[in-house]
From Swiss-Prot:
Name this protein carries in UniProt: Caerin-4.3
Localization per Swiss-Prot or TrEMBL: Secreted
GO biological process, alphabetically ordered: defense response to bacterium
Protein family per UniProt: Belongs to the frog skin active peptide (FSAP) family. Caerin subfamily.
C-alpha cells in the first residue's frame, strides 16, 4: 500500500545518506 511505498522511500533515502557518509 501507500504506507509501504513511503517506508521504502524513507529506507532508500536513509541508505543513500549512510552511503554518502561512508564514502
Amino acid at each position: 500500500g501507500l504506507w509501504q511505498k513511503i517506508k521504502n522511500a524513507a529506507g532508500d533515502l536513509a541508505s543513500g545518506i549512510v552511503e554518502g557518509i561512508k564514502s
